[in-house]
Amino acid sequence: MKYGKVSFLALLCSLYVRGSLADPESEQEPLVFNPTEVKAPLVEQFQGAWSERWIPSHAKRFVNGIEEMSYVGEWTVEESSGPGALKGEAGLVMKDEAAHHAISYEFDEPINEPEKDLVVQYEVNPEEGLNCGGAYLKLLAEPTHGEMSNSIDYRIMFGPDKCGVNDRVHFIFKHKNPLTGEYSEKHLDSRPASLLKPGITNLYTLIVKPDQTFEVRINGDVVRQGSLFYDFIPPVLPPVEIYDPEDIKPADWVDEPEIPDPNAVKPDDWDEDAPRMIPDPDAVKPEDWLEDEPLYIPDPEAQKPEDWDDEEDGDWIPSEIINPKCIEGAGCGEWKPPMIRNPNYRGPWSPPMIPNPEFIGEWYPRKIPNPDYFDDDHPSHFGPLYGVGFELWTMQPNIRFSNIYVGHSIEDAERLGNETFLPKLKAERELLSKQESMEKQSMHVDEESNQILEKFLDVYDIIKAKLPPNVAEKVDYYVETIIETPEIGIAIVAVLGSLTAVILTCYFYFFASSSPASLSTGTTEAEKEQQEKFKQETETEKIDVSYAPETESPTAKNED
């Protein structure tokens, strides 16, 4: 069957074009993971009995004292995968989409050495991307006893958080007011973007130093640094002085810098009553304006419904339509000139403003010592850290965490990153570059394909007008197939190499072996019966025919 031949050709062409655009990854020798020798209060690479160290939580989540939901999200440890994966490396994976997840690790002994650097570092890989969800961790202010939840207090929250256009890396710490004993959150004021991309690992590092400075690094690069005193909202230290809340502005205090000129007089020619808009005095009614014709008329084709009851429903009134005469002419009904801006409009008059001779200045309450003021030279003294917890919501599954470091050595954290992150960096960045390149190439190919298809249809419209009806009907089927499945259509066009050649090839392929009568405008009864049978077959097997092998049909037998 010739339709099968062309369909199979189209399929091969499509596969050929796809294959020519594909860029298969070259096979590379997998990198091998070696457990680090770095030591710290926490160096977690999820080897061995990880489930004895990390306890998933099944606690209830409460918001404003009301139970919201349970932490039902599943946690697993899985070997790394992807182009940059280290063979044998494992990571903690947040598995479920649209779910709350919570898990925690408790230190053998609380960490509380404020005279040393505090370094927090870990890797995050959103294997399927992260459009809305958190990937930050918390350094905990109390033991969890395996029941991590939003009610467990924390000292520091650090890491990426992304939802829609909000994309940032958090650094939040809690500071204790020495006067009241209360803790308040201090948020980093200018938060860097997370740089999260599907299947790409990022390394996040936080360094807090005893001199009250900090650094946030992403992939080893310092993206934010500053002072615990000056770069957080609200500030750590309250103001030394505040405005006196009991101070009152004197009654004779003049704080208006300008006043209306008391000597100004409204000009005699100032017309406050002049309208803002006036009819255009130069406008002329169009000659074809039908002033006696109504704009709307009853619809002459409207019919009273059969079930309309005048006694119950009232008098039936047909719907109205725009008067056709009004559409043909310039307009109908009473003609009015268009409105224009009044050149003489000036609006209400008001005297000009002049400097106020009695102006004293803007009034402020006097300053008094802040009764709530306190000083703290060491906001980096966060207090004892009892463990690490993840308490997260995510809309995407399979968020991977690996190579977690919590300790006091910047050098050791860098060494760990060199061992685990840098080997993945090159391979994953090559993948990212390849993905971006293929996306650009795909956009370019799609644009060219659309242009080719548009030209093809333009040429076909010209030729179709000269084709006999029975021929045009058959060719139409294939043109519709090209439009509905442009991959096949563009492949055929690309292989044949010429838009005109495509149409002529289709024409002669189908009809060169047919009898002259089949190209004439007349059609015999036998041919009509044959065409109707073919039409029914193609309609019932339309999906199958584009990928069907060559088969016989009554039409094919007659043509062969």
From Swiss-Prot:
Annotated membrane topology: Single-pass type I membrane protein
A GO-annotated cellular component: endoplasmic reticulum
Localization per Swiss-Prot or TrEMBL: Endoplasmic reticulum membrane
Cytoplasmic side: 513-560
Glycosylation sites: 418
Sites where the protein binds an alpha-D-glucoside: 136, 138, 154, 161, 391
Stated role: Calcium-binding protein that interacts with newly synthesized monoglucosylated glycoproteins in the endoplasmic reticulum. It may act in assisting protein assembly and/or in the retention within the ER of unassembled protein subunits. It seems to play a major role in the quality control apparatus of the ER by the retention of incorrectly folded proteins.
Family: Belongs to the calreticulin family.
Protein name (Swiss-Prot/TrEMBL): Calnexin homolog
Record gene name: cal1
